[in-house]
UniProtKB/Swiss-Prot annotation:
Posttranslational modification: Is synthesized initially as an inactive proenzyme. Formation of the active enzyme involves a self-maturation process in which the active site pyruvoyl group is generated from an internal serine residue via an autocatalytic post-translational modification. Two non-identical subunits are generated from the proenzyme in this reaction, and the pyruvate is formed at the N-terminus of the alpha chain, which is derived from the carboxyl end of the proenzyme.
Similarity comment text for this entry: Belongs to the prokaryotic AdoMetDC family. Type 2 subfamily.
Cofactor requirement: pyruvate
Taxonomic lineage: Bacteria, Pseudomonadati, Pseudomonadota, Gammaproteobacteria, Enterobacterales
Reactions listed under catalytic activity: S-adenosyl-L-methionine + H(+) = S-adenosyl 3-(methylsulfanyl)propylamine + CO2
Cited Pfam families: AdoMet_dc
Protein name: S-adenosylmethionine decarboxylase proenzyme
Membrane recorded as keyword: no
GO cellular component terms listed in the entry, alphabetical order: cytosol
Site (described: Cleavage (non-hydrolytic)): 111-112
InterPro entries: AdoMetDC_fam_prok, S-AdoMet_deCO2ase_bac, S-AdoMet_deCO2ase_core
């Protein structure tokens, strides 16, 4: 896309929001309580603050304020307000490619807020437990929050991810013409690294004329031992392993497709 010479500030708002899900099987009530306590501690407000603060570092933003809260009986929220920084337009990368990984860092952000909320959940029947984290990165200016996507998905490894990206508003060039998007994008997938894309089955639902992009991700490989909490698959009977595997896959597909699947 040809570089635009703008009249005043770039007034486009770019919002990236995604849900990540972690699924687990806990055989007993004690194990279910243990999983909820474990995941709640793993993603407590302090840990989430570290992840989001590193995100700000990656995109080169100044943190103005941090509001964080752990909730009872479970869950946490963190919101970070970020200030704009001077940006040299010549240094802005508007190409469609993956953002940095945790070990690679440099981009600039004009203005942003970043927030995350967590939702651990379980049910006494079936032994299935889920953990959901909702994350939103919203910016005003020349940089797309998609540059933070790769890092955040790597940090919050998950079984299912649903991602939404939208560009709102408009900005004007020096001739007064309105521009409703200032960068090229065909798919959110183009902002993910190859190793990330190789791990997931993905599908896009995009409304290009409205600058709305949606991608869903489902982990390809399934190893039962990674989904058991304090129980080893070898300690179960073959029938139990098959039943638990079927229940986990059904749960994951229902979340991925956003609808209940009738039992066959």
């Amino acid at each position: 896309m040809k570089k635009l010479k703008l009249h005043g500030f770039n007034n486009l708002t770019k919002s990236l929001s995604f849900c990540i899900y972690d699924i687990c099987y806990a055989k007993t009530a004690e194990e279910r309580d243990g999983y909820i306590a474990y995941i709640d501690e793993l993603y407590n407000a302090n840990r989430l603050t570290e992840i989001l603060s590193e995100t700000c570092s990656i995109i080169g933003a100044n943190i103005l304020n941090i509001a964080r809260q752990d909730y009872e009986p479970q869950g946490a929220s963190v919101t970070i307000l970020v200030s704009e920084e001077p940006v040299d337009p010549q240094l802005i990368d508007k190409t469609e490619h993956p953002g940095p990984l945790p070990e690679a860092v440099v981009a600039h952000l004009d203005k942003s807020h970043i927030c995350v909320h967590t939702y651990p959940e379980s049910h006494p029947e079936g032994g299935l437990c889920t953990f959901r984290a909702d994350i939103e990165v919203s910016t005003c200016g020349v940089i797309s929050p998609l540059k933070a996507l790769n890092y955040l998905i790597h940090q919050l490894e998950s079984d299912i991810v649903t991602i939404d990206y939208r560009v709102r508003g408009f900005t004007r060039d020096v001739n007064g013409m309105k521009h409703f998007i200032d960068h090229e994008i065909n798919s959110i997938q183009n902002f993910m690294s190859d190793d990330m894309k190789s791990l997931y089955d993905m599908v896009d639902v995009n409304v290009y004329q409205e600058n709305i992009f949606h991608t869903k991700m489902l982990l390809k490989e399934f190893d039962l031992k990674h989904y058991m909490f304090h129980t080893k698959p070898e300690d179960l009977t073959e029938t139990e392993r098959k039943e638990i595997t079927a229940a986990l896959w059904k749960e994951m597909r229902e979340i991925y497709y956003g609808r209940n699947i009738p039992a066959v």
